[in-house]
C-alpha cells in the first residue's frame, strides 16, 4: 500500500515537473537604432519562446545585427530565400502558410542570427516540439505589424537591432496592494457574515419599518449544492475555453449585474444611517416601486447601477478602469460572503477540498489533455492567445505593475487574483466567526483562520516568484486555512461540535441587536381576561406557538418573578420579556 502511494506521488511530482518545464512564451525587447545615425534607439515588444534559444538579459551583452525587411515573403520554402541568404542578419518575415519551425529552419540554414515574424494579429507563442527545439539554435520571436511600420518609418530602411529579454523584479509592489485587498475582504466579509447571521437569529421576528430594510436571507450550502456547483464550474470553464469570444460577454454582463447588487448591499447600511432622504415615493402600481422605497435608497440603487455601467463601457481603459473593477469586485465578494453560508465545518471541508482538486486539475493536468499543451485555467483567466475580442474576464482583482521595467511596453501590466481565491476561503472564515460567537470563544477561530489565509497568500506569492508563472492560489490557501481551523478545534477540544456545527445550539447571552419590545410577534391573548401561567395542557388550540415552546408554559421566574400579566405590547409585559431568557424559537439552533 505504501509503495503504491509513493508511486502515485512520484507520478504527480513528475507531472508537476514536466509542466514546470513547459515554458510557453516570454516577453522580450528588440532595440532598434539607425545604421546611418540619427534618432536615439527605441525598444519594441516581442514575444519569444526560450526553448528555441535564450536571449541575453542585458542590452550590453546583445549583438547588434542588420535588420532586414523580408516581409514580402512568407519564408515557407527555399524559393523564398534571397540569393545571398541572411548571413549575420535578423530577417523580418510575414506570418502564415507554414509552421514556425519551417520558417526558422530556413532562416538558420541561410545564415540568419535570429528571426522576427511579423504578425497582423495578436501575438502568439512561436511553438514547436522537443526535436525541433534541439535542432534550432537561433532565437525566434513575433513582432506586431504596427511596430514593424514604426521601425522603418522612424529609422529608415537601414537599421540595426539587438534582441534581449530584461529581467523583471521577482515581486512587484502591487502584490502588497493585492494582499491588503484580499485579506481585508476576507476579514471584513467573514466578520460581517458572522455578525449578521447571529443578528438575524436574534431578530428573526422583527418587523422592518420599510420594505427596503429587508435583508437578503442567507443560503445554506448543502453537499448536493456543492457537487452541482463544481459541475457547473467545470462545464463553464470548458465552454469558455472553446467558446471564449461568445461567452466572455455573458460573463461581463453577469458581473455588471452582480457587482451593482453587491455594491448596493454594502452601501445600504451606511445610507440608512443618514438623517435625510427618508421620504418615500408616491403610491404607484409599478413593479418594485409599488412598495414605495425611500428616496435615498432609490438614489443609491441608481448610483450603483451607474458605477457598474461606467465600468462596463470603459472596462478596457487600463489607466483607471481597474480601480472600478476592484471596487465592484470587493463589493461583490462581500455580498457573496454574507449571503452564502456553510452550516458546518464538514460542509466547509467538502467545498474547499473539491475546489482544491478542481484548481489543481485545470491548472496542472489539463496541459496534458489539450492539443496546444496549455492550461485551461490559465488560458481562460488571462484570455486565449487567439481571441479575436481581446476581452478579459472581470472576475479578478487586478493591479498594474508598479516597478518600472522596459517590459511595461508589452501587454502584461497587471497582476491578478481571482475572486474564487477570496470567496472559497472566506466562507470558512465566516463559519469560524459564527462559531466563535456561538461558543463565546473570543473569536479565536476567526482570527486564526484569517491569519492562516494571509500566510497562505504569502506562500502563493513566494511560489509565483520562484516559478515565474501563474499559480493556483487554492493549492496553498486551502491547506493553510483548513489545517489551522482544525488545529484550533483540537487544541480547544471542540472538534466534534466544530465539525457538526452543534455549538450553535448553545444558549446565548442577550444580544445588543435584540428587537424592540413591542415589535416581536405575540401569541394571541384574550384582552378581556388577565393572563396567568398555565400548564401546557391548557394551551389554546389556536396558538401559533408549539406546545413545548409556548410562552404560557413558562414559569413565573422566566416571565419575570411576580410580574402581573398584561395585554400584548403593554410596557409591563415587554419588560418581563426582556428579562427572560431567549425563547427556543429565536435561538440559533434549529437551522445551524
From Swiss-Prot:
A GO cellular-component term linked to this record: Golgi membrane
Comp. bias intervals (Polar residues): 580-592
Subcellular location: Cell membrane; Golgi apparatus membrane; Lysosome membrane; Endosome membrane
Segments on the Cytoplasmic side according to the record's topology features: 196-221, 272-293, 341-348, 434-445, 492-592
Ranges of Pro residues composition bias in the record: 512-524
PTM annotation, UniProt: Glycosylated.
Signal peptide location: 1-25
Active-site residues annotated for this sequence: 359, 421
Regions crossing the membrane: 175-195, 222-244, 249-271, 294-314, 320-340, 349-369, 413-433, 446-466, 471-491
Keyword Phosphoprotein: no
Sequence ranges assigned to domain PA in this UniProt record: 71-149
Cited SMART domains: PSN
Segments for region (Disordered): 512-592
Location of the motif PAL: 472-474
Membrane topology: Multi-pass membrane protein
Keyword annotations of the record: Cell membrane, Endosome, Glycoprotein, Golgi apparatus, Hydrolase, Lysosome, Membrane, Protease, Signal, Transmembrane, Transmembrane helix
Organs and tissues of expression: Expressed predominantly in adrenal cortex and mammary gland.
EC number of the protein: 3.4.23.-
Quaternary structure, from the entry: Monomer. Homodimer. Interacts with ITM2B. Interacts with TNF. Interacts with the simian foamy virus envelope glycoprotein gp130 and its processed leader peptide gp18LP; preferentially interacts with the leader peptide gp18LP.
Domain notes: The PAL motif is required for normal active site conformation. The catalytic domains embedded in the membrane are in the opposite orientation to that of the presenilin protein family; therefore, it is predicted to cleave type II-oriented substrate peptides like the prototypic protease SPP.
Function according to Swiss-Prot or TrEMBL: Intramembrane-cleaving aspartic protease (I-CLiP) that cleaves type II membrane signal peptides in the hydrophobic plane of the membrane. Functions in ITM2B and TNF processing. Catalyzes the intramembrane cleavage of the anchored fragment of shed TNF-alpha (TNF), which promotes the release of the intracellular domain (ICD) for signaling to the nucleus. May play a role in the regulation of innate and adaptive immunity.
Protein family membership: Belongs to the peptidase A22B family.
Name of this chain's protein: Signal peptide peptidase-like 2B
Recorded name of the encoding gene: SPPL2B
Amino acid at each position: 500500500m505504501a509503495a503504491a502511494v509513493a508511486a502515485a506521488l512520484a507520478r504527480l511530482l513528475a507531472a508537476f515537473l514536466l509542466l514546470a518545464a513547459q515554458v510557453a512564451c516570454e516577453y522580450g525587447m528588440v532595440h532598434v537604432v539607425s545604421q546611418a545615425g540619427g534618432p536615439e534607439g527605441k525598444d519594441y515588444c516581442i514575444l519569444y519562446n526560450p526553448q528555441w534559444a535564450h536571449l541575453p538579459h542585458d542590452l550590453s551583452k546583445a549583438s547588434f545585427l542588420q535588420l532586414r525587411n523580408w516581409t514580402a515573403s512568407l519564408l515557407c520554402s527555399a524559393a523564398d530565400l534571397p540569393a545571398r541568404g541572411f548571413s549575420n542578419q535578423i530577417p523580418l518575415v510575414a506570418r502564415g502558410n507554414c509552421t514556425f519551425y519551417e520558417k526558422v529552419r530556413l532562416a538558420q540554414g541561410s545564415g540568419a542570427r535570429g528571426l522576427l515574424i511579423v504578425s497582423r494579429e495578436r501575438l502568439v507563442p512561436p511553438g514547436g516540439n522537443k526535436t525541433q527545439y534541439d535542432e534550432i539554435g537561433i532565437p525566434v520571436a513575433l513582432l506586431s505589424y504596427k511596430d514593424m511600420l514604426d521601425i522603418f518609418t522612424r529609422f529608415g530602411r537601414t537599421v540595426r537591432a539587438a534582441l534581449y529579454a530584461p529581467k523583471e523584479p521577482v515581486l512587484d509592489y502591487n502584490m502588497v496592494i493585492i494582499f491588503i485587498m484580499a485579506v481585508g475582504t476576507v476579514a471584513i466579509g467573514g466578520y460581517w457574515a458572522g455578525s449578521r447571521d447571529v443578528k438575524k437569529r436574534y431578530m428573526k421576528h422583527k418587523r422592518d419599518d420599510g420594505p427596503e430594510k429587508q435583508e437578503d436571507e442567507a443560503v445554506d450550502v448543502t453537499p448536493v449544492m456543492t457537487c452541482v456547483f463544481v459541475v457547473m464550474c467545470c462545464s463553464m470553464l470548458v465552454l469558455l475555453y472553446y467558446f471564449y469570444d461568445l461567452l466572455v460577454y455573458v460573463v461581463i454582463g453577469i458581473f455588471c449585474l452582480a457587482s451593482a447588487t453587491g455594491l448596493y448591499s454594502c452601501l445600504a447600511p451606511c445610507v440608512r444611517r443618514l438623517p435625510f432622504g427618508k421620504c418615500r415615493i408616491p403610491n404607484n402600481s409599478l413593479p418594485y416601486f409599488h412598495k414605495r422605497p425611500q428616496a435615498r435608497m432609490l438614489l443609491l440603487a441608481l448610483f450603483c447601477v451607474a458605477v457598474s455601467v461606467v465600468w462596463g463601457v470603459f472596462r478596457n481603459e487600463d489607466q483607471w478602469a481597474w480601480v472600478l473593477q476592484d471596487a465592484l469586485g470587493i463589493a461583490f465578494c462581500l455580498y457573496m460572503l454574507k449571503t452564502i453560508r456553510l452550516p458546518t465545518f464538514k460542509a466547509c471541508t467538502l467545498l474547499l477540498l473539491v475546489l482544491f482538486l478542481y484548481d489543481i486539475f485545470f491548472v496542472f493536468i489539463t496541459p496534458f489533455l489539450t492539443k496546444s499543451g496549455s492550461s485551461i485555467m490559465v488560458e481562460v483567466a488571462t484570455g486565449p492567445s487567439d481571441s479575436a475580442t481581446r476581452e478579459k474576464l472581470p472576475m479578478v482583482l487586478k493591479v498594474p505593475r508598479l516597478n518600472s521595467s522596459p517590459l511595461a511596453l508589452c501587454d502584461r501590466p497587471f497582476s491578478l487574483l481571482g475572486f474564487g481565491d477570496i470567496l472559497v476561503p472566506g466562507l470558512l472564515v465566516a463559519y469560524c466567526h459564527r462559531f466563535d460567537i456561538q461558543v463565546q470563544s473570543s473569536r479565536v477561530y476567526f482570527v486564526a483562520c484569517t491569519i492562516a489565509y494571509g500566510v497562505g497568500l504569502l506562500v502563493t506569492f513566494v511560489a509565483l516568484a520562484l516559478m515565474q508563472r501563474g499559480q493556483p492560489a487554492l493549492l496553498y490557501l486551502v491547506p493553510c486555512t483548513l489545517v489551522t481551523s482544525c488545529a484550533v478545534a483540537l487544541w480547544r477540544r471542540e472538534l466534534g461540535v466544530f465539525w457538526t456545527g452543534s455549538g450553535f445550539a448553545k444558549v446565548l447571552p442577550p444580544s445588543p441587536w435584540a428587537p424592540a419590545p413591542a415589535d416581536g410577534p405575540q401569541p394571541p391573548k384574550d384582552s378581556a381576561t388577565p393572563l396567568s401561567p398555565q400548564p401546557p395542557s391548557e394551551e389554546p388550540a389556536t396558538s401559533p406557538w408549539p406546545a413545548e415552546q409556548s410562552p404560557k408554559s413558562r414559569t413565573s421566574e422566566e416571565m419575570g418573578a411576580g410580574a402581573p400579566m398584561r395585554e400584548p405590547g403593554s410596557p409591563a409585559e415587554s419588560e418581563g420579556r426582556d428579562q427572560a431568557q431567549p425563547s427556543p424559537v429565536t435561538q440559533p439552533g434549529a437551522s445551524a
